[in-house]
Design a protein with these regions (language model features):
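Structured mid-to-C-terminal alpha-helical surface segments
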Residues: 1-31, 36-46, 57, 72-275
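Glycine-rich beta-strand-to-loop/alpha-helix junction loops that act as flexible
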Residues: 49-52
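Short glycine-biased active-site loop of nucleotidyltransferases that positions the nucleotide triphosphate
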Residues: 55-63
């Protein structure tokens, strides 16, 4: 369905291939979801984090599919469904019909649930106009704390603010995922790409928040030395071919990966700044 606002948002992207078009539609839809959440006041009690946050607000040069949110304080009675109408209304303004459903985690396989806490609710946003596109939203209602946030501006579909984790805390979440995530019996290359981005941009790692994540997710009282050991072990033993294959569909320039090797990432680990 043609819509001036939606089409204008899409026009900022390279739509040459079907994969590029799919990635662009994903990202425009993600921004529409953020606009809906802002309209209902969601960011008064929650913050955006993860790879999609890094992509939208900090220019990460890869596309990202899922959307991760953390409450600012633990609240096991938090009801995300009250934000559904605002998300639906945001899409209706650009001529799109969406459906939002809470997923039953009892139906998750071991792989899907391996990195998902009991206190994380999962929702799927599906689209009538793009049947193949489904955006998964995760909301951690009992999150690891000791993180900082900031307000970040988006101008489309209209001007609004999104509360986001600061970069050092985004980095902490990514490093926890890189070291501990078990994902389809292989590594998630997107974690590695993001790790490279943080080091290249000289972002310090908030170890206090990282330690909080390790304690809550893994019941580990981690020290900096032990974490470095775990990181080096993961980086030096992973199958780099699998790492590259996972991230390729989300890349604008695949040649960026030519230099990737186990040694390359081990050297990156030595460049991580701790705060």
């Amino acid at each position: 369905m043609k819509n001036e606002i939606f089409d204008n948002m899409l026009s900022r992207y390279d739509l040459t291939t079907e994969q590029q078009k799919r990635n662009a539609i994903f990202e425009v839809n993600q921004q529409m979801i953020l606009a809906g959440l802002y309209a209902r006041g969601f960011f008064e009690s929650a913050a955006f984090y993860g790879g999609t946050c890094l992509r939208i607000f900090h220019g990460l040069q890869r596309f990202s599919e899922d959307m991760d949110f953390s409450l600012l304080a633990q609240d096991d009675k938090f009801d995300f469904t009250k934000y559904f109408p605002a998300i639906i209304d945001a899409f209706a303004m650009v001529g799109r019909e969406v459906e939002i459903k809470k997923k039953d985690k009892k139906n998750f396989g071991k792989v899907e649930s391996a990195f998902l806490k009991d206190n994380t609710d999962v929702y799927d946003v599906t689209f009538q106009t793009e049947k193949s596109i489904k955006i998964k939203i995760e909301v951690d209602t009992c999150p690891p704390l000791n993180f900082k946030t900031e307000q970040k501006l988006l101008l489309q579909p209209h001007s609004f603010m999104t509360r986001c984790f600061t970069l050092p805390d985004l980095f902490a979440g990514k490093m926890h995922a890189l070291v501990y995530r078990a994902w389809k019996n292989r590594v998630k290359g997107r974690d590695w790409y993001d790790f490279e981005w943080y080091v290249r941009h000289n972002v310090p790692l908030d170890f206090t928040h990282l330690a909080e994540r390790c304690k809550q997710f893994n019941n580990e009282d981690i020290t900096l030395e032990l974490f470095k050991e775990k990181l080096i072990e993961r980086l030096s033993t992973a199958d780099i071919k699998q790492v590259k294959e996972d991230v390729l569909p989300f890349m604008r320039n695949p040649k960026e990966l030519d230099i990737w090797s186990n040694d390359y990432f081990v050297q990156l680990a030595g460049m991580v700044r701790i705060e």
